[in-house]
Amino acid sequence: MKKVVVDASVAAKWVVEEAHSAKAVRLLDCDEIHAPDHWLAEAVNVLWSKVLKGDLDAKDANERMTVLTRSPVIATPIAGLMASAFAIAVEHSVTIYDSLYIALAEERAFPLLTADEKFVRRFQDTPLSKRVTWVGDLG
């Protein structure tokens, strides 16, 4: 894949070792990686959660946050995506946060890569399913 949209669940796997992290890391080799500009807050929230649970110490989480802030993601302002994201959210009963990713993927005609299986299932039998790919299905 040359140009992709990734969500925060994929970006978090760049810095937190979990199932399919290696597949997520390989996406960093794509020519272009896009995300709505709220992606970073969502990905860093994963680190915060790991600190709260005692899975990471704050210093380590801070270093991983720095890796995320330096990642090659092309962030798109969410204001221009909001109308389509809202329509997607209402039609498919997903959060605005999640629908922003698929709105961007639709706008750019790029695949959306996610590590969120529930999100993939939400769009399984809809026309948007062609846009959404679970990172676990990558080769």
PLM-predicted stretches and their roles:
Residues 1-38, 53-62, 118:
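Short, well-structured N-terminal submotif of metal-dependent ribonuclease cores
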Residues 1-3, 36, 102, 106-139:
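Acidic, PIN/NYN-like endoribonuclease modules and their adjacent C-terminal/linker elements
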Residues 13-15, 46, 122:
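Residues that scaffold the ATP/ADP-binding catalytic core of kinase and kinase-like folds
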Residues 23, 42, 84, 121-122:
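Phosphate- and divalent-cation-binding pockets in alpha/beta enzyme and binding domains
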Residues 39-40, 60, 81, 101:
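Short, conserved alpha-helical segments within structured domains
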Residues 44-72:
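Active-site-proximal, substrate-binding regions of enzyme catalytic domains
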Residues 55-56, 94, 128:
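Helix N-cap/coil-helix junction residues
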Residues 73-117:
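Active-site neighborhoods of divalent-metal-dependent phosphate/nucleic-acid chemistry enzymes
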